[in-house]
Amino acid sequence: RVRHPVINAWYKSRNYHDDHGEGMDFYKVGTGRGCGGIGVFNAGACFTSGNWVTQNHLASGPVRTVFELTYAPWACGNGVTVSETRRVSLDAGSHLTRFESRFTLAGAASVAGGPGLDISAGHLHNGLLATDPEQGWLANYEPAQTGKGSICTALVLPHGGTLATDAQGCVYLLGTL
């Protein structure tokens, strides 16, 4: 709605789920993977990281904000551990956020993993899911919320993958890590 950056002010005030004339971010992640949280599928189960443990602010300007998040190694079954460093780029005026992840594995040469999109009714993300795993995308259009509007979340990868779903209802687009 506005042509000036609002993210810093929203997060500083801790009030970004309500519209005060500049729009809002009413997407609630809760304990789910949200939009883009990584899942590793190994030993017949999905394994996810905890919250990030370190952050590094790389750039903050009128056009782009960039930061990196580091996640502690997490166990992924059969003696495999994975750690992640994720770079997040937010461009002013864009409806998309860029995530670039680097993974370190121990205990295996590779595992199946990738970003997820929470479509569970338990997290109020019970929308209309569309996918094209061969083209590398999935999207969820959620029903309108009174006083807030609608939200659409999507994942777009530079390559195709295969779909997998975890026990909580999050759908993942998997590749090889």
Language-model regions, residue ranges each:
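Short, hydrophobic/aromatic-enriched beta-strand segments in well-ordered soluble domains
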Residues: 67-71, 115, 153-154, 177
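Extended, loop-rich substrate-binding clefts of extracytoplasmic carbohydrate-active enzymes
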Residues: 8-93
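Generic recognition of long tandem-repeat/solenoid scaffolds
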Residues: 65-70, 136-140, 173
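Beta-strand-rich recognition/accessory modules
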Residues: 153-177
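A recognition module on extended beta-rich or small alphabeta surfaces enriched in W/G with H and D/E
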Residues: 131-162
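An acidic-aromatic substrate-binding cleft motif
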Residues: 1
